[in-house]
C-alpha cells in the first residue's frame, strides 16, 4: 500500500503581520509622554512615512487588510504609507491599537513627573508591570488589550498579509510577548519610527518574529542617528 504524502501534509494557517510605529512626532523630540494624548508628526516624521509608502509601492507590496490606531499620529502615518499604493481608503481605525494610556503622566516629561509626582515617577521608572497611573493603564492591562486585538485581527486574515500602524509601546509589547521578554525587564532594543517589523501569526502556534526594525527606507544620516 502506498501513501499519498500530499494527503498527510498539514496545512499551515498563517497571517503575515507588518507592524509599524508611527512617524516621529513633536512630543517624541521633546521627550513628552503621549499616551492617549496626541502630537503632530514632525516634518521628518511625515517624510519617514512618505518614504515607507514609496518603498511599498516600488516593491509592489499591497495588503489584504490595513488597521491603524485611531490616534492622529498613527492615522496620519497610515494614510501617508498607503496613499502611494492607493490603499488609504482601506484603513480601519481602531482604539484597540492605541498606545498605553498614561493618565496623569500624559503631556509631561520625565523631569516634570519627577518634580510634581515623585511617587509616580518612582513606580513609573521601576518597570513594575502592575503600576497604573491615575486615569491610565498598567502594562499588563495594555498587553492584554493589544494581544486580544491583534489575535482577532490575525484570525480574520488567514493566509493573508496585513498592515497595522500603531505605537512604540505596543510594538515593544508584541516583541516581548513573542520572545518571552518579561515586561519588567529594561528595554534593550530600539523601536525606530516607521521601522518595518514583521510577525507571523500561526493559527495553532501563535506569534513568531520574522523581521525587526528594518529602516532601509531612511537616508544615510537618519540611519546613523538611529545607531547613536
List where the protein language model places each region.
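Acidic, low-complexity terminal tails and accessory targeting/binding regions
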Residues: 3-15, 58, 83, 87, ...
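Short, hydrophobic/glycine-enriched beta-strand segments
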Residues: 16-22, 164-165
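General small-molecule cofactor/ligand-binding pocket signal
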Residues: 18, 92-94, 210
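Active-site metal-binding loops of divalent metal-dependent hydrolases
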Residues: 23, 168, 215
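Loop-to-helix element that buttresses phosphate recognition and phosphoryl-transfer chemistry
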Residues: 24-76, 80-81, 132-147
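Phosphate-coordination/substrate-recognition cap region in phosphate-metabolizing enzymes
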Residues: 51-121
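Extended, charge-rich low-complexity interaction segments
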Residues: 120-135, 219-228
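GST-like fold's C-terminal all-alpha helical module
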Residues: 142-156, 160-168
